[in-house]
Amino acid sequence: MMRARFPLLLLGVVFLASVSVSFGIAYWEKQNPSHNKCLRSCNSEKDSYRNQACHARCNLLKVEEEEECEEGQIPRPRPQHPERERQQHGEKEEDEGEQPRPFPFPRPRQPHQEEEHEQKEEHEWHRKEEKHGGKGSEEEQDEREHPRPHQPHQKEEEKHEWQHKQEKHQGKESEEEEEDQDEDEEQDKESQESEGSESQREPRRHKNKNPFHFNSKRFQTLFKNQYGHVRVLQRFNKRSQQLQNLRDYRILEFNSKPNTLLLPHHADADYLIVILNGTAILTLVNNDDRDSYNLQSGDALRVPAGTTYYVVNPDNDENLRMITLAIPVNKPGRFESFFLSSTQAQQSYLQGFSKNILEASYDTKFEEINKVLFGREEGQQQGEERLQESVIVEISKKQIRELSKHAKSSSRKTISSEDKPFNLRSRDPIYSNKLGKLFEITPEKNPQLRDLDVFLSVVDMNEGALFLPHFNSKAIVVLVINEGEANIELVGIKEQQQRQQQEEQPLEVRKYRAELSEQDIFVIPAGYPVVVNATSDLNFFAFGINAENNQRNFLAGSKDNVISQIPSQVQELAFPGSAKDIENLIKSQSESYFVDAQPQQKEEGNKGRKGPLSSILRAFY
């Protein structure tokens, strides 16, 4: 009986086993879809070697998936195969049966390793995140444990940013940009230190650089030797976006020792030259003539773009110092100097022409031209020429006497010449008292200045004098400190508050302070109230740009005071004090333009000064 049933029992066991195996295989295939798909793809391989290699890859994939399940890790998007990555940029899709080579799963990394590894992985991750891009950001710890691929829109942003940087870089001179950045950092540090004890009490986040102050370190040397130097100031718009309207203007400084010559040259820029110290013989060379002028401190002259000129310092003892406002004509804010002669510092621009062009132009053999103009004789190697060291050279007293014979002095009787030098002190000062004087020539009075739309000023102040608070209606003023020291305060509107005007936030003013000394430059934007306090005997020059119809408006003093011209009815609405209080306050200052910075304190005067003007004037105290 048992023997008869045994085959049936055995058959049932086999049946149950086969069913279990089938269910197990089905379950395993469900849990291991990648391995199953990989095996099916191997069946299409007819070559035995490739078939075995394919099964080996599938087994490796199986082991990795089992390890992941054992470790309890959440499956991550697998790195993209290089071919698939190219498909994302529009290439033809590959056959589904062709499987990518498995990549090892990324292990958790320390935070300092993430940044280094990020660049290696950013082009290898699969684009699965694109399908789930709406999810919020994870915590930092999760990001460190489970690195995620960059989102596509981030890649696009990075790509556009990189392209933008490349285009920007191609349009700039990298050396000058790096120098500007270094100088900005240095100037930031200096301006923060100059704030003094008052600024040290402010929170650090409120300490910002003074974008209007350019100290002598902001100059870049173009030529220099033992006889002098030529320097150019950093571009205004590179210092601050607030100075964008000065992007077409540059400041040049020339300094030379006695008995020296600045070699003949021209520039692709209009020059407005002012003699700060010393004397000069400046000669303009034209096609059929030349004009030589004896210049001294306070003299000014326009040198049109493309005009060849040279400068001699004829004095035996005093250095010559000139300041120049340059207005480039080819490229905004950029200009070049073209020297006729070759020196060790630069080549003659004539050397840029071809040999046959020079021979035809001078109807002379090139060897003779090379010897006469460029100092190179036949057989000499480069570097053996008889050349001057730089563009500033020594000149003998005999040569100076010969050059002085035909030089004319600048006119002190007229300031309206179209092409001759003029002196800033040739007329009476427009503001003057025992504490200071201001001389000024405007475009309306001089054709040379009218063409450039610039006014010129020179100011002399005694130690302890205060140039009263005022603002210019249109002109942007560039101060050049020639001698002495001063403290300057400039008032503007805080940029942060400007951005909040639409939100009806109250406007706040910001005070820009600077300690100025010799060779410093300070820019005063139009409409910004400013005050200058001379801490020693002071002399400075000023270029007023966009000067036509400019008006200087004073905020204190007995004359030309804007506040005193406001009707009493409006004054009472504008200020907390009564019209009578405001009138008494204005009249308490008997001087105008230049006053004593430390007047004798009067008890009654102090009471009157403490409350009435809750306005922009408070920024000066």
Swiss-Prot record:
<keyword id="KW-0758">Storage protein</keyword>
<dbReference type="InterPro" id="IPR050253">
    <property type="entry name" value="Seed_Storage-Functional"/>
</dbReference>
<keyword id="KW-0020">Allergen</keyword>
<comment type="subunit">
    <text>The alpha-, alpha'-, and beta-subunits associate in various combinations to form trimeric proteins.</text>
</comment>
<keyword id="KW-0732">Signal</keyword>
<dbReference type="InterPro" id="IPR006045">
    <property type="entry name" value="Cupin_1"/>
</dbReference>
<keyword id="KW-0325">Glycoprotein</keyword>
<feature type="compositionally biased region" description="Basic and acidic residues">
    <location>
        <begin position="80"/>
        <end position="92"/>
    </location>
</feature>
<feature type="region of interest" description="Disordered">
    <location>
        <begin position="64"/>
        <end position="214"/>
    </location>
</feature>
<keyword id="KW-0256">Endoplasmic reticulum</keyword>
<dbReference type="InterPro" id="IPR014710">
    <property type="entry name" value="RmlC-like_jellyroll"/>
</dbReference>
<feature type="signal peptide">
    <location>
        <begin position="1"/>
        <end position="24"/>
    </location>
</feature>
<dbReference type="InterPro" id="IPR011051">
    <property type="entry name" value="RmlC_Cupin_sf"/>
</dbReference>
<keyword id="KW-1015">Disulfide bond</keyword>
<dbReference type="GO" id="GO:0005783">
    <property type="term" value="C:endoplasmic reticulum"/>
</dbReference>
<keyword id="KW-0926">Vacuole</keyword>
<keyword id="KW-0708">Seed storage protein</keyword>
<feature type="glycosylation site" description="N-linked (GlcNAc...) asparagine">
    <location>
        <position position="533"/>
    </location>
</feature>
<feature type="propeptide">
    <location>
        <begin position="25"/>
        <end position="62"/>
    </location>
</feature>
<feature type="domain" description="Cupin type-1 2">
    <location>
        <begin position="422"/>
        <end position="583"/>
    </location>
</feature>
<feature type="glycosylation site" description="N-linked (GlcNAc...) asparagine">
    <location>
        <position position="277"/>
    </location>
</feature>
<feature type="compositionally biased region" description="Acidic residues">
    <location>
        <begin position="174"/>
        <end position="196"/>
    </location>
</feature>
<comment type="similarity">
    <text>Belongs to the 7S seed storage protein family.</text>
</comment>
<dbReference type="Pfam" id="PF00190">
    <property type="entry name" value="Cupin_1"/>
</dbReference>
<protein>
    <recommendedName>
        <fullName>Beta-conglycinin alpha' subunit</fullName>
    </recommendedName>
</protein>
<feature type="region of interest" description="Necessary for sorting to protein storage vacuole">
    <location>
        <begin position="612"/>
        <end position="621"/>
    </location>
</feature>
<feature type="compositionally biased region" description="Basic and acidic residues">
    <location>
        <begin position="111"/>
        <end position="173"/>
    </location>
</feature>
<dbReference type="GO" id="GO:0045735">
    <property type="term" value="F:nutrient reservoir activity"/>
</dbReference>
<feature type="domain" description="Cupin type-1 1">
    <location>
        <begin position="212"/>
        <end position="370"/>
    </location>
</feature>
<comment type="function">
    <text>Seed storage protein. Accumulates during seed development and is hydrolyzed after germination to provide a carbon and nitrogen source for the developing seedling.</text>
</comment>
<dbReference type="GO" id="GO:0033095">
    <property type="term" value="C:aleurone grain"/>
</dbReference>
<dbReference type="GO" id="GO:0000326">
    <property type="term" value="C:protein storage vacuole"/>
</dbReference>
